[in-house]
């Protein structure tokens, strides 16, 4: 616990703590000021158009060519879109749900709604229609922006249950000629055309709307994590969002010359944090991919300087590296292993705050230019200055590997309810086991029961759809996460309080820690550790189909598909070797004693994961109860009746016999 003379704002925060706290940490005592003249996102856009109007704001790849959008263009498109909404009857406090891929038009719709004194609400584009329904209903949206036919069809299929919806705005009309006569549908181009006409009739309306807003107004709705059910509508003000972006820039250097690659769903608070909270305040370039299938190639072409992604993204990148190195010749593998050894030696000394010798610095530079730089170039990370990971705790192994390869990786901790960030690593003060220190003007405390609570100007206004379910008490946000503070004043996130496992001998086990160690293998896509009150630890594993399939082909193992491959004896042998490797570094009571390779992947469409790829543990335990019970018997296999989903979306029941493997 920090001692001495506390800043007044820290004292006030601690005095308002709703319960006794065990310890606390706080961020830098520096002012984070939101300029009164530019205290909303649309006002920032107007400022950027005036001050850096001819600079590139956005870049989008179309037909293989990067298209440039200046800040003046950006403002003009938002202005026409906003006035077009008003011409169609959009009113103050109206809500608009946004469903689509990362495109400039998504940003236009978001900022246009704000400029019209409304509230945008981004939802994940891979939601099924039945998952979209409660989100749209709970948000009270009267307007919906859809990117294309796929999203439009979803909304039209549930429209009878959405009587409040007045218009659906569609960007891409490819294949939609038969929809032309539907009065509910209107194109983005038509909305902008109406906006241009209204702008000529009322030339001061747009600026008048902007000037009537302030930092206290609701900027957007954002979805909560949704690990326990339907995600909630989190209300965030402009002050919440802008404070977080400006506070981040106090401890992370960002300039107008940065390139950010936007490829994670814009519905995720992390992406909105970068594109709006940081992009608009800093003025850096935001780049969009051409199609989801071209993300990897487009990322390499952009070579971003800033990148933010959840652990799954970084794990997939590293799995690609691991598989390619495994396929390389002996000499290349030897050189790579030597380079990694040098990298690990250096970063481990950095983590401990120890000096690196001149010889090791030279060896590290050599390893970087000969081995790591070409690899990072292939991944699109050669120019990276700041790489952030958040949304979940990244594996220590992945973190060390990325840092060893020369990626300036930093862990972020936060929730949607605190506008995305409350803690992160600082340059020169990084630890793979922690989430760093609080942002400026932010206090983090640990309660007596071990829960992480936070207080800062970025804490949400509340839940729009469930005001009675408030996780904020006297300005303190209750996270539901278990944590502690280490000797360096870093926050250590253990796991979700509800997920921490207590074994029969009283040992506390963090499922997330063990799961991350398992997923460091390129052959394990997902893992779930089981279970509270049981005599020993077991696991349900999902194979990484692409990597295991390649391994099977290289070893002449025939298979017909995921289900068949997952149950091969040879694959179980492969997975057992992974489990044994993880067990080597675990105390006896924490070792994984049994595992099963599930016949299918955990899937957000089956509601087994959230859209940010977090496990819905309660649902999984209920759905696979028979499987879990079998893991705690002497059974060597189990016959299970489950469900599979085909590529065309149809479902079918399937009876599958799954092996249970004991690890001695």
Please tell me what each predicted stretch does.
Residues 501, 526-528, 533-535, 551, ...:
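Conserved C-terminal "lid"/linker of ANL adenylate-forming enzymes
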Residues 68-72, 189, 211, 219-244:
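Conserved AMP-binding A3 loop
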Residues 150-213, 321-374:
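ANL superfamily adenylate-forming
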Residues 242-259, 266-373, 383:
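Conserved AMP-binding/adenylation subdomain of ANL enzymes
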Residues 37, 46, 57-111, 128-133, ...:
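Conserved AMP-binding/adenylate-forming core of the ANL superfamily
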Residues 53-56, 186, 192, 196-223, ...:
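Conserved pre-ATP/AMP-binding loop-to-beta segment of ANL
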Residues 127-160, 244-261, 292-306, 378:
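Conserved ATP-dependent adenylate/AMP-binding module captured primarily in the ANL superfamily
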Residues 438-503, 531:
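Conserved ATP-binding/catalytic segment of the ANL
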């Amino acid at each position: 616990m920090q001692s001495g003379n506390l800043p007044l704002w820290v004292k006030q925060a601690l005095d308002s703590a709703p319960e006794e706290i065990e310890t606390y940490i706080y961020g830098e005592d520096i002012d984070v000021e939101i300029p009164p003249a530019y205290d909303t996102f649309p006002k920032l856009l107007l400022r950027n158009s005036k001050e850096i109007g001819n600079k590139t704001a956005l870049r989008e790849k179309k037909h293989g060519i990067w298209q440039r959008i200046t800040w003046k263009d950006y403002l003009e498109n938002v202005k026409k879109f906003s006035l077009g909404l008003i011409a169609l009857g959009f009113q103050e406090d109206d809500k608009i749900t946004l469903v689509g891929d990362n495109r400039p038009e998504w940003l236009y719709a978001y900022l246009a709604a704000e400029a019209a004194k409304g509230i945008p609400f981004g939802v994940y584009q891979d939601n099924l229609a039945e998952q979209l329904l409660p989100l749209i209903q709970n948000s009270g949206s009267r307007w919906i922006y859809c990117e294309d036919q796929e999203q439009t069809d979803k909304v039209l299929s549930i429209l009878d249950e959405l009587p409040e919806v007045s218009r659906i705005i569609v960007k891409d009309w490819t294949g939609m000629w038969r929809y032309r006569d539907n009065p509910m549908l209107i194109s983005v181009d038509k909305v902008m055309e109406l906006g241009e006409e209204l702008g000529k009739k009322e030339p001061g309306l747009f600026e008048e709307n902007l000037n009537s807003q302030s930092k206290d107004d609701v900027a957007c709705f954002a979805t909560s994590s949704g690990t326990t059910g339907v995600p909630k509508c989190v209300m965030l003000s402009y002050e919440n969002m802008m404070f977080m972006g400006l506070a981040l820039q106090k401890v992370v250097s960002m300039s107008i010359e940065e390139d950010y690659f936007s490829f994670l769903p814009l519905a995720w608070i992390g992406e909105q944090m970068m594109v709006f909270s940081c992009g608009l305040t800093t003025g850096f370039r935001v780049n969009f991919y051409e199609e989801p299938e071209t993300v990897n190639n487009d990322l390499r072409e952009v070579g971003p300087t800033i990148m933010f992604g959840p652990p799954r993204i970084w794990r997939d990148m590293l799995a690609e590296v691991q598989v390619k190195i495994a396929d390389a010749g002996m000499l290349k593998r030897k050189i790579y292993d030597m380079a990694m050894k040098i990298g690990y030696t250096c970063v481990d000394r950095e983590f401990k705050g120890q000096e690196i010798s001149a010889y090791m610095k030279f060896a590290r530079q050599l390893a970087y230019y000969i081995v790591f730089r070409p690899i990072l170039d292939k991944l699109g990370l050669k120019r990276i200055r700041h790489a952030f990971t958040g949304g979940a705790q990244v594996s220590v192994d992945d973190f060390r590997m990325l840092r060893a390869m020369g990626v300036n990786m930093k862990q972020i901790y936060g929730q949607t309810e605190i506008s995305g960030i409350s803690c992160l690593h600082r340059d020169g003060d990084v630890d793979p086991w922690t989430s760093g220190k609080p942002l400026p003007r932010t206090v983090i405390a640990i309660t007596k029961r071990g829960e992480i609570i936070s207080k800062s100007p970025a804490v949400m206004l509340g839940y729009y759809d469930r005001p009675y379910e408030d996780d904020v008490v006297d300005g303190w946000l209750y996270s539901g996460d278990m944590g502690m503070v280490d000797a360096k004043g870093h926050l250590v996130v253990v796991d979700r309080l509800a997920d921490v496992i207590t074994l029969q001998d009283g040992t506390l086990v963090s499922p997330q820690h063990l799961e991350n160690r398992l997923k460091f293998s390129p052959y394990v896509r997902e893992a779930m550790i089981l279970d509270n009150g049981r005599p020993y630890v077991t696991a349900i594993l999902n194979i990484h189909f692409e990597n295991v399939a390649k391994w099977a082909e290289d070893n002449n193992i025939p298979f017909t598909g995921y289900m068949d491959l997952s149950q091969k004896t040879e694959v179980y042998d492969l997975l057992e070797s992974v489990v044994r490797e993880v067990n080597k570094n675990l105390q006896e009571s924490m070792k994984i004693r049994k595992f099963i390779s599930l016949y299918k992947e955990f899937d957000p469409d089956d509601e087994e994961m959230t859209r940010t790829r977090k496990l819905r543990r309660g649902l999984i335990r209920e759905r696979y109860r028979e499987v879990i019970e079998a893991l705690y018997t002497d059974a060597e296999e189990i016959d299970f009746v489950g469900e599979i989903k085909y590529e065309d979306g149809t479902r079918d029941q399937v009876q599958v016999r799954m092996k249970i493997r004991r690890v001695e």
